[in-house]
């Protein structure tokens, strides 16, 4: 099954997450099909906190990819509706 989920990056105590499309059997930070955005939980007011590539996100949801709970929550917070 193809899922859209967060893959952790960054440094110790400075998390940064890529929003990736991957097979559900792959490791959290392992191989992925496509990067469709990012989430920076420690962003200050000058930095962008969340960014989605909406056309690619809608494509993957349209072909059957499932959103993880955390990605669905981020989309809801941004008041964005995935197709």
Curated annotation (Swiss-Prot):
Coiled-coil stretches: none
The keyword Transmembrane is assigned to this record: no
Gene Ontology biological-process annotations: translation
Keyword Transcription set for record: no
Taxonomic superkingdom: Bacteria
InterPro entries (UniProt xref): Ribosomal_bS16, Ribosomal_bS16_CS, Ribosomal_bS16_dom_sf
Gene Ontology molecular function, alphabetical: structural constituent of ribosome
This protein's GO CC annotations: cytoplasm; small ribosomal subunit
Pfam families: Ribosomal_S16 (PF00886)
Keywords for the protein's UniProt record, in alphabetical order: Ribonucleoprotein, Ribosomal protein
Stated family: Belongs to the bacterial ribosomal protein bS16 family.
Listed name of the protein: Small ribosomal subunit protein bS16
Lineage: Bacteria, Pseudomonadati, Pseudomonadota, Betaproteobacteria, Neisseriales
């Amino acid at each position: 099954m193809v899922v859209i989920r967060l893959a952790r990056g960054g440094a110790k105590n400075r998390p940064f997450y890529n929003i990736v499309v991957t097979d559900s059997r792959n490791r959290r930070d392992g191989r992925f099909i496509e990067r469709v955005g990012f989430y920076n939980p420690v962003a200050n007011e000058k930095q962008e906190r969340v960014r989605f590539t909406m056309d690619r996100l809608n494509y993957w949801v349209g072909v059957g990819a499932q959103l993880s709970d955390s990605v669905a929550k981020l989309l809801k917070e941004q008041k964005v509706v995935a197709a």
